[in-house]
Amino acid sequence: METLLLDGETLTLEQVRAVATGAARAALAPAARERVRRSRALVDARLEDGEAHYGINTGFGTLAEVRIPRADLERLQRNLVLSHAAGVGAPLPLPEARALVLLRANVLAKGVSGIRERTLDLLLAMLERGVVPVVPERGSVGASGDLAPLAHLALVLIGDGEAFLAPPGAAGRPERLPGGEALRRAGLEPVVLQPKEGLALVNGTQAMAAVGTLALLRAERLAALADLAGAMTLEGLLGSHRPFAPEIQAARGQPGQIAAAAHLRALLAGSELNASHQGPGCHKVQDPYSLRCMPQVHGAARDGIGFCRGVLAREVNAATDNPLVFPDTGEIVSGGNFHGQPVALALDVLAVAASHLAAISERRVEQLVNPSLSGLPPFLAPQHGLNSGFMIAQVTSAALVSENKVLCHPASVDSIPSSAGREDHVSMGMTAALKARQVVENVRTCLAIELLVAAQALDLRAPLRPAQRVAEAHARLRERVPHLSEDRALHRDIEAVSSLVDEGGLEL
């Protein structure tokens, strides 16, 4: 198994996924360890200068003017973690929680947060030994960072809170245990937080970035899958390949459109079905937009998803603590890097971009099941009337598309003041992340429905064969789901194709 060396500078989104899914380990890079030592030394030195330093020897938020006696500084950090662990709702799924731990460790490795080596080492040891904090999803407004989610992570470090014990490679369901018990079972000891450490752990954008990164990577795969689903539908509807010609795309110059059209051309190459309806015998002049404009719509989605990638690729290596500790200049400086606006905006874009992959997919399903549009039996049903075929599969897709329209209302346009007005503009970045995650989940299901219905249409076009890559995808799908010869409970078929998608079984 690969071991990633965290330095706060070079972590990639794909590496985040690898650690989140247990496919890679993480350790602290030697150079990063030295930076951590130096930043901690500066914090310790500042404790002796008699000055007020925010979050080190003062209260927090609107209580920043309150000086804390030296004897109470450890208690101050513990109280910060305890008081901020006010999250509610379902726990983050294990991959997202592991990504959260990884991202917090990575940004601490930058050496500008004043954390001790021991505390950072415990964070990484928790990842290594499968101690995954129970982190409620809700309760963050995205500035001052994701306070509540990160506080629940920090609880486990001090032997409090709850954690799942899920060692990498272990069989069975993870155990949910008190945090101290999970550490003990893993052979680890909690830490007593020193000045600045509680703040270094809870102040940052890593919860929204963790959820957003995994949603983004899934959306990127679905953007390619949307081309495959569209190609399969196009073949089933005897649609034209001509709108995907490179000269059309070049005349506009949008990069996502050019990439989507190239992918569609590759998927559709060598189609017997296409050859069968060329020439004078074909009465179609133009296909509906949901077929003809796939490069434009899928391409715009790719571009929006790409924008989100750029923001998150920077954010996973970003110092979002406050104050920041700069050993080279000897300064400890308060700022606003904890504000999640860049991530919130990007995740809203991700949700909107991905939603269009489902919206156009549902319209293609309508083309397939409507006999006046497809020339095929109503709802692709054998003995229609007695059988309803894929009638309600299309309704399910429509329901998810409409749900996405609600979810795509941007979280990042909202703000609500907190902390007695000191924190008077916030990002709602975690809300954007959770919404984007659900939108992407709905897109996956809509594309699975389209693939299921399009496969039936291809069956009905036999013996003519579709393009080779479409035929290969059809064959893989048929290994999981048989042809619909009479009505059956379609939810099982939808789940089977969805699982095939999640496993990457249709990535050609």
Swiss-Prot record:
Post-translational modification: Contains an active site 4-methylidene-imidazol-5-one (MIO), which is formed autocatalytically by cyclization and dehydration of residues Ala-Ser-Gly.
InterPro entries: Aromatic_Lyase, Fumarase/histidase_N, HutH, L-Aspartase-like, Phe/His_NH3-lyase_AS
Keywords annotated in UniProt: Cytoplasm, Histidine metabolism, Lyase
Family matches, as SUPFAM superfamilies: L-aspartase-like
Family of the protein in this entry: Belongs to the PAL/histidase family.
Primary localization class, coarse: cytoplasm
Lineage top rank: taxon: Bacteria
Catalysed reaction, written as an equation: L-histidine = trans-urocanate + NH4(+)
Coiled-coil blocks: none
Official protein name in the record: Histidine ammonia-lyase
Enzyme class: lyase
Enzyme Commission code(s) on record: 4.3.1.3
Subcellular location: Cytoplasm
Residues with PTM 2,3-didehydroalanine (Ser): 144
Family annotation (HAMAP family): His_ammonia_lyase (MF_00229)
Pfam families: Lyase_aromatic (PF00221)
One term under GO cellular component: cytoplasm
Record-listed cross-link 5-imidazolinone (Ala-Gly), residues: 143-145
Any one GO molecular-function label of the UniProt entry: histidine ammonia-lyase activity
Pathway of action: Amino-acid degradation; L-histidine degradation into L-glutamate; N-formimidoyl-L-glutamate from L-histidine: step 1/3
Any GO BP: L-histidine catabolic process to glutamate and formamide
